[in-house]
Each structure stands twice: as C-alpha cells, then as structure tokens.
C-alpha cells in the first residue's frame, strides 16, 4: 500500500472566542453590496444620473422662461390698458387732435429714451 493521503488545506483556526460561545459561527462583516458592482457600471450609472439631472435642469429652465414670458405679457397688457385709460381721460378734457399730438410726442420721447 502506498500512503497517498490527500492533504486538504484546513481552515486556519482563529483561536477561542472571547465570550466562550465556541458553538456559534464566526461573524463576518455585513456588506451585501460590496464588490457586486464594477467600476465601469458605477461610472455608467453616474453618467446616467448626471444626464437625468441635466435634463431636469433644462426642463426647469424652460418652465421658468415660459413663466417669465407670461408675466411679461401680463405687465405689457396692463401698461397698455392704463395708457389707453389715461388717454381717454385726457380726451374728455381736451380736443381729440391735441390728444393725438400728445400721443405721438410721448411715443417719440419713449423711443429716444430707450
């Protein structure tokens, strides 16, 4: 007979537990996601997240621009209405031709000032 004993490498013993409960399994660190995602996958996920954020930012800017344009239209409409009412009040007191001359004069001044 030949002595061919298969020498399986045994787990190195870690020694006795401090609390003496040697019948329990040794605890391992709880890291369920450690090493599961590769660096490339993380980079890809980060890129995707940045693209989503950029898209959201663009949508927000577009919405804000629409809101500001709407507010500007309302302000212009109100200003035109006030100007019209002011000219109507002036027309009650003055002659129509004089009011038209004043309108033209004010428009010229407005163009020069802007």
Curated annotation (Swiss-Prot):
The keyword Protease does not apply. Keywords: Coiled coil, Nucleus, Ribosome biogenesis, rRNA processing. Residues 39-93 have a biased composition (Basic and acidic residues). Residues 39-101 form a coiled coil. One of its GO terms (biological process) is rRNA processing. Residues 1-114 are annotated as: Disordered. One of its GO terms (cellular component) is nucleolus. The keyword Transferase does not apply. Residues 94-114 have a biased composition (Basic residues). It holds the Pfam family Cgr1. It is found in: Nucleus, Nucleolus. It comes from the Eukaryota. Belongs to the CGR1 family. Involved in nucleolar integrity and required for processing of the pre-rRNA for the 60S ribosome subunit. This is rRNA-processing protein cgrA.
């Amino acid at each position: 007979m030949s002595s061919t004993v298969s020498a399986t490498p045994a787990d190195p013993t870690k020694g006795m537990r401090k609390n003496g409960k040697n019948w329990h399994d040794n605890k391992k660190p709880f890291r369920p996601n450690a090493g599961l995602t590769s660096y490339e996958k993380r980079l890809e996920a980060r890129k995707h997240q940045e693209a989503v954020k950029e898209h959201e930012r663009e949508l927000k800017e577009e919405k804000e621009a629409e809101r500001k344009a709407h507010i500007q239209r309302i302000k212009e409409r109100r200003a035109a209405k006030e100007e019209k009412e002011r000219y109507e009040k002036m027309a009650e007191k003055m002659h129509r031709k004089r009011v038209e001359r004043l309108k033209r004069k004010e428009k010229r001044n407005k163009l020069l000032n802007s």
